[in-house]
Amino acid sequence: MTLDVADFCCPEYITEMVDRVKRSWIERQGLVGVTTMVFTIRRDGTIVDIRREKSSGFEVLDSQPERALVLTRSLAPLPAQFPNQTLTVHMEFDYQR
């Protein structure tokens, strides 16, 4: 799992976010591919605007990251030192055999 969050201030927040999403993601599917998702985290930690940015080419692989993000639903509020009201995240879900 890799992600792009530009120049985000707080690496510990990112670590916790990845851990929370990974707990809901079914990583082993017997196929190889990468699905890229984009979503927004609101100031209160709510995950919104979940969408597929790039398909793996396999619906079974593409549906799992969305499911993981929906199940995660919310995270800790964005850190006080982060100045924006939202954080846009581009996350790759990498499936390997």
Where are these regions (language model features)?
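Solvent-exposed, well-ordered amphipathic alpha-helical segments
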Residues: 13, 50-51, 61, 90, ...
